[in-house]
Curated annotation (Swiss-Prot):
The active site is at residues 72, 141, 143, 148. It comes from Cronobacter sakazakii (strain ATCC BAA-894) (Enterobacter sakazakii). This is Glucosamine-6-phosphate deaminase. CDD domains: GlcN6P_deaminase. Pathway: Amino-sugar metabolism; N-acetylneuraminate degradation; D-fructose 6-phosphate from N-acetylneuraminate: step 5/5. Homohexamer. One of its GO terms (molecular function) is identical protein binding. HAMAP family: GlcN6P_deamin (MF_01241).
Length: 266
């Protein structure tokens, strides 16, 4: 596992965007051989999306031959609701880059057959071979996507009941009213994430410090879903300074020295 310790959310977003752009450009995708990118929603990736849009506008990257799969979607929220993840992705990213509509894959939280929708999503991912890079965030309780504590580390795309803590955390997007936050969501599984060629998780703020500590210094534990990254051959965590407050001094020093060349010029 790599840990990239930075100072601010802006630096985290910029580092993540540069990493994605390098991966896409090194892959040199074509129509017949697209780069497959997994994407998250929420507040954490916003700086990364801003930086990706800037790099696209500067001619540094094209998304014409990139295929995307999003991590999750609320169940029962209309697609055009401002807080649906469909709306979020178009508003904050897709509308600003050159990705073709047919290359965008989002879970349908209003599908008449939820189980069939989850199977369809998994099958479509498999049809592309694998996701080359999956970017994600993490919840205060260590959840990745909506894989809440005690999720199976072998799980696939499915419906999940959201914990009260997750709904409270997300209520800030719903006018502070937890009752407006859907109780269920569709989410890729932990196993789906671990199948990706590379997983990059962004961690911001002191409220994520326990989750980061569990990911880096704790044991693999289904109560801290983020700890599954220890099982992945190519995992990278990009974090800001407040999120590192629970790490041991020697742990942080180790990764800071190890990544010194990779965190310059931000």
């Amino acid at each position: 596992m790599r840990l990239i310790p930075l100072a601010t959310p802006q630096q985290v977003g910029k580092w993540a965007a540069r990493h994605i752009v390098k991966r896409i450009n090194d892959f040199n995708p074509t129509a017949d051989r697209p780069f497959v990118l997994g994407l998250p929603t929420g507040g954490t990736p916003l700086e990364a999306y801003k930086a990706l849009i800037e790099m696209h506008k500067a001619g540094q990257v094209s998304f014409k031959h990139v295929v995307t799969f999003n991590m999750d979607e609320y169940v029962g929220l209309p697609k055009d609701h401002p807080e649906s993840y469909h709306s979020f992705m178009y508003r904050n990213f897709f509308d600003h880059v050159d990705i073709p509509e047919e290359n965008i894959n989002l879970l349908d939280g209003n599908a008449p057959d939820i189980d069939a929708e989850c199977r369809r999503y998994e099958e479509k991912i498999r049809a592309y071979g694998k996701i080359h890079l999956f970017m994600g965030g993490v919840g205060n309780d260590g959840h990745i996507a909506f894989n809440e504590p005690a999720s199976s580390l072998a799980s696939r795309t499915r419906i999940k009941t959201l914990t009260h803590d997750t709904r409270v955390a997300n209520s800030r997007f719903f006018g502070g009213d937890v009752n407006q936050v859907p109780k269920y969501a569709l989410t890729v599984g932990v196993g789906t994430l671990l199948d990706a060629q590379e997983v990059m998780i962004l961690v911001l703020g002191h409220v994520k410090a326990q989750a980061l500590q569990a990911a880096v210094e704790g044991n693999v534990n289904h109560m801290w879903t983020i700890s599954c990254l220890q099982l992945h051959p190519k995992a990278v965590i990009v974090c800001d300074e407040p999120s590192t407050m629970e790490l041991k001094v020697k742990t942080l020093k180790y990764f800071t020295e190890l990544e010194a060349e990779n965190i310059k010029d931000l």
